Amino acid sequence: MKKYLLIVVFALAGVSASAQFGVSYHQSSIPNLGFNFEYQDRYFAELRFGPNQYFEHLALELTANYIFLNKEDYDFYGGIGGRTTQLEGLVIPAGVNIYPFDNKNFGFHIEAAALLGETSVLRGSWGIRYRFGGTRIPSPQKDE
């Protein structure tokens, strides 16, 4: 499974020239640090690492997500992916990104993800998200 994750990561590097890079932290009983590429304002792939663990137990998770509802201050997404090591198997995330500030690069997220494998778990998480580069949706112009 790790070989497949590496292949997908290198394939995503090819589209990174037209993608927006971001980072996220998912706080839960199974926390994750994520690195993502957002492509064409509708798709994003996220590679997640499970911190707070020994290296031999480090869990890798890769998800491909589609943004179903894309508004100025929030978006709703869902996807599918896989997870290695701890709770190995299929991952089905669904969540909301909220961008409440004028700077739409920084925001918060809430996510529920089904982890399906030998043991099935429903993981709920919340956290922060930051997108590098230009804003995806410009802030509304204020009349003076």
Question: Which role does the model predict for each range below?
Answer:
Residues 1-20, 134-144:
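Cleavable N-terminal export/targeting peptides
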Residues 19-22, 41-46, 75-77, 109:
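Short, hydrophobic/aromatic-rich segments at coil-to-beta transitions
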Residues 20-35, 48-60, 72, 82-91, ...:
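Solvent-exposed loop/turn segments connecting transmembrane beta-strands
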Residues 20-22, 30-32, 96-98, 106-112, ...:
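A membrane-pore/channel beta-structure motif
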Residues 37-39, 64-68, 84, 96-100, ...:
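Residue-level signature of outer-membrane beta-barrel architecture
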Residues 64, 120-144:
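Outer-membrane beta-barrel "beta-signal"
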Residues 69-76, 101-106, 135-144:
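Short loop/turn motifs that connect adjacent beta-strands in outer-membrane beta-barrel proteins
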Residues 92, 112-114, 140-144:
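Outer-membrane beta-barrel porins/channels
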